[in-house]
Amino acid sequence: MKIDSIIVAGYFVIVFIAGYFVSRHYKKASAGDFITGGRDRTWYQVAFALFAMAADPAIISLCGLGFLWGFYIIQWNSVHMWFTAWFAAMFIVPIYWRSRIVTTPEYLEKRFSLPCRSLFSLLLMAALIITLSGAVYLGALLLENFLGWPLWSSMILISAIIGFYVILGGMKTVLTMDFYQGIFVIVTLVIVIVAVVNKVGGFAVLANSSIISKAGVSIHTIVPPSDWSLTTTKFFPTQAILAWAPITGLAWLSCNFSMAQRLLAAKSEQDAQKGLLAVAILAVFYPLASFVVGCLMRIKMPDILPDEAFIKAILVMVPVGLRGILIAGLMAALLSTVDGMLTASSALFTEDFYSRIIRKDATPTELKKVVRIAEILTILLTLALIPIIRKADSVMVFIQDFYAYVFGVTIAIYLIGMFTKKVAPRSGFIAMITSVALTIALDVFSDVNFAYIGVFSFIVTIVMFFSLSVFEKQPATAVDLENLTVHTLSDAKGPWVGLKAWPGLWKWALALAASWVVFSFCWEAFMRSLANS
């Protein structure tokens, strides 16, 4: 345990020193570069930064899902990323890139109205800060469980390290740090899966298991169960995966500013597109490791709690020393997620509220100062919310419900704005508010599965928008929609606008879809061959 503590402490020291030198290098960056990252990242830098942001400590929660529901849950992640990344690269990235937005809510103002922008930005900031508090708490809990470090001291340490290099160097520093930490996270996951699989006796143990998951299917199958009931308690049956995963995946990549901020930092539109497709593959890798470990722990330790599966795997199956490296890898995932949320929430406040509403004539120097103050206040608010989060039954359930409430509504508005020329700003705002309210009511007063609630919010928003827009008077003067829809891009028109910057995009999109099918068949064949040997 002492050796592990030394390794993790050494990792924190390295991050602190690296953060200091990288921050010093970017300390004099302009206000725009401080917020956006300078728009100079190559596609692989974008991909690793996106991956580091996505691969947070929820790895532990995913392991628990694999323990309880089985390996088929990976289909959610596959559809969630592989079938939406190409869509976002083809249609959404060209619009974001040409419209030169700084935050994702800014698109809603350019396309619809300022109230739409302000509402979504406010909701997104709230979600980011709550998720940030949960991530810091979870990271400190890991250090307490694995190494015996004091909980509050660990939370303050994590916040201080991240706050130091984020506040000093801004988004450019975050992108540089996340690139290397993303690589470290991948190495960590490889070590975890190799160590656990070898310890339990190989994949044959999983293939020969007769354990039935809570979903009623074999724990090792990749085929999801079928359930047509809207009130099903199963976690992502086939119908829910096909209906909700593409919607929430597209929203997560396109509307969620903490992810889109990294796309907007690419040095070209093509780099953003390539980075998006690359992370679609990488982002399925960490659930693969988590679910395999969860399933194997169900076989070896069936009596433990699902959320203990990952922790027990490291404590029992990984030797001292190597355990410290793995914990450091988990901390890398944590830091990359937390620094991304910190920069995103402060940028949202600065761009969507301070410079747009509070002080429109703010100078670049003033904006840079405001960003730093917002980051300090966000860290303090994050720590202040942790006692409340500790009392909550499940922070992750709350966040999951929030995304069902908001992301289905928001991506519907975005898609309407991008694929139609209809100008109806009031209809957009009313549809957003009403749909969110109806979605919350449906969740509170019914037993409908949260995935179907998200689909409901998506459909209701579209129907309500077009119904209301019939009665909305069109503006007397023509509205400039240049670079705001797929029909009005300045240099690319037609259904496949993404091919303008990257003509080979369609080939890689097909390859990505084919990879999903091949992976599914190969996994099932692999399990059956081991079971029959």
Region roles according to the model:
Residues 1-533:
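Membrane-embedded helix-loop-helix hairpins and adjacent transmembrane boundary segments
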